[in-house]
Amino acid sequence: MRGAFYVATAFLIASSTRTAAESVQIKSEITQDLDKLPVGDSDTKSLPRRSLKGSGDRLEIPVAEEERVIPTGVLEGAGKDVSEAILRLEKSGDDLNKMVKVGEGVGSSATSKGKRIQIFQKSHKDAVAEHQQVFDTYKHAIKKNEALELERDTALIKSHNWKLLSDYFSAQAAKDTKNYHNYHTIFSQLDSVVTPATASYKGIKNTREKYLALLEESFSRANAAKHAGNMDEYNEIQVTVAEL
């Protein structure tokens, strides 16, 4: 069964991001423990000694669960969850490594060896589940980050639109202010023209009223002189009115 132990242990070590040195040390310890098994009490038919290369007891390992690189700390807020999942995966590998180093489950009977294989297989399954959980957490973090980026871009677009509106109304307000000053200047200039014209109009009006009053008085005096038979005075008044 050494081939099965080697493959299962090597896969778990790779999944828990162990170094190459640790992998060599563990494989060496597994080989030493198996070489120390008592031969007399063992079932030689069920436990043939095979080379680690080309062992028929090699465990089938899903291709989809091959070693991956965990990009921890990529996303703010999700990095903590990803790190914790990685720590759980490494702890699972540590537990299995400790089990191999201390020789837990190593017995002289086929039953003990079968139990030991079941323990390794369960640890392998748990490690794969932890490994998958890391990527599920990371995918969730990616989606959350994309949603946050979408909200950020939407906010930037709204902010840009508000700035455009603000700039437009600011420019319009500046234009209206300029127009107001222009109109105020024009009205001031018109006032400087209208005021003298108004004064002149009032002067002309007063002169006309005086002229009409003088004519009325002259006609009254002329009629009175004519009725009195004073023709010299009447003629004099006629000459004065003609000169007006």
From Swiss-Prot:
Region (Disordered): 37-56
Induction (UniProt): Expression is up-regulated during the early plant infection stages.
Motif range (RxLR-dEER): 50-68
First and last residue of the signal peptide: 1-21
Entry keywords, A to Z: Host cytoplasm, Host nucleus, Secreted, Signal, Virulence
Top-level taxonomic group: Eukaryota
Residue stretches of biased makeup (Basic and acidic residues): 37-46
Subcellular location: Secreted; Host cytoplasm; Host nucleus
Family (UniProt): Belongs to the RxLR effector family.
UniProt free text on domains: The RxLR-dEER motif acts to carry the protein into the host cell cytoplasm through binding to cell surface phosphatidylinositol-3-phosphate.
Described purpose of this protein according to its UniProt entry: Secreted effector that suppresses pattern-triggered immunity (PTI) in plant host.
Entry protein name: Secreted RxLR effector protein RXLR-C05
Organism taxonomic ancestry: Eukaryota, Sar, Stramenopiles, Oomycota, Peronosporales
